[in-house]
Amino acid sequence: MTDEGRPKTPAAITTECSLIVEQHLNVEFYRESRAKFLSTCDDYALMMLVSKDHGNKFWFSIWEHQIDWFENQNIPNQYFTLACGGSDLMFLFPVALFQSWKEDLSSRIYPKNGRKYWHINIKQVSGIWNLQTKKEFDDISLEEFQIGEK
């Protein structure tokens, strides 16, 4: 169980998802930790986050320490992958793009450790998968980042 009392995603699911990303990028990864993958060619870093299906909505958190991990890598191609309920629906996007979205997203400081995290809420609206932003901003379409077929 995590600190919040929720069970962790089984490692087999993140591995299955990483294999699909390998095919999509035509690169081979090895696992550095439960969610972190590096390519054997040293050109790619990948963070694999998995959400349960919450009725056609998916929730994630991206933490400051996860961004710090990317910043400490001397690797040109850095990606987040958001796996929505498993490997059938995933969104793959560059970390640099997430950096440009951060101000539009809700964030919080976790009181137990003082770390900042961003709320990542994905919802399908009128057939389009969107990253939901704060009310004063337009939601971000994730269609161009979709891999998988849900």
Language-model features and meaning:
Residues 50-52, 135:
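A broadly conserved detector of short glycine/acidic/proline-rich loop/turn motifs that flank catalytic sites
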Residues 91, 96-150:
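Non-catalytic C-terminal interaction segments of nucleic acid-processing enzymes
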Residues 1-42, 52-53:
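Acidic-basic catalytic patches of nuclease active cores, encompassing PD-(D/E)XK
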